[in-house]
From Swiss-Prot:
A GO MF term: structural constituent of ribosome
UniProt protein name: Small ribosomal subunit protein uS8
Source taxon at top rank: Bacteria
GO-annotated cellular components: ribonucleoprotein complex; ribosome
PROSITE patterns: RIBOSOMAL_S8
Quaternary state and interactors: Part of the 30S ribosomal subunit. Contacts proteins S5 and S12.
Reported function: One of the primary rRNA binding proteins, it binds directly to 16S rRNA central domain where it helps coordinate assembly of the platform of the 30S subunit.
SUPFAM superfamilies, alphabetized: Ribosomal protein S8
Length: 130
């Protein structure tokens, strides 16, 4: 069976893994998923990520907890295959008043909403993480 939205699947696996207090979650790997995992690690939402080089590459994300509670409170897909959401540099959202991040796909690559504002670029809003 083919997957219609692999990014939504990735976010759902992270959400479900943290709800069940799993140490890590595994999923099929892709360049965009690895870029999202890198941003989540840089922003402190996950502990680590690794790509296993096999016949079918697999991405493993080590989840992060603080005092027994998941660090990621909400993780939500915004732009989806059926309805793409694009925002200009002045329209980029601030998630939870700046406490969370919006992951934006720009012409300069994947970055957070803060980095996109600093670079003066807009793009496709992939997801919100708080």
């Amino acid at each position: 069976m083919s997957m219609q939205d692999p990014i939504a699947d990735m976010l759902t696996r992270i959400r479900n893994g943290q709800a069940a207090n799993h140490v890590s979650v595994k999923m099929p790997s892709a360049k965009l998923k690895v870029a999202i995992a890198k941003l989540l690690k840089d922003e402190g939402f996950i502990t680590e990520y690794a790509v296993a080089d096999e016949a079918k590459p697999e991405l493993e994300i080590t989840l992060k907890y603080f005092q027994g509670k998941p660090v990621v409170e909400t993780i939500q897909r915004v732009s989806r295959p059926g309805l793409r959401i694009y925002k200009g540099k002045d329209e980029l959202p601030k998630v939870m008043g700046g406490l969370g991040i919006a992951i934006v796909s720009t012409s300069q690559g994947l970055m957070t909403d803060r980095a996109a504002r600093q670079n003066g670029t807009g793009g496709e809003v992939i997801c919100y993480v708080a």
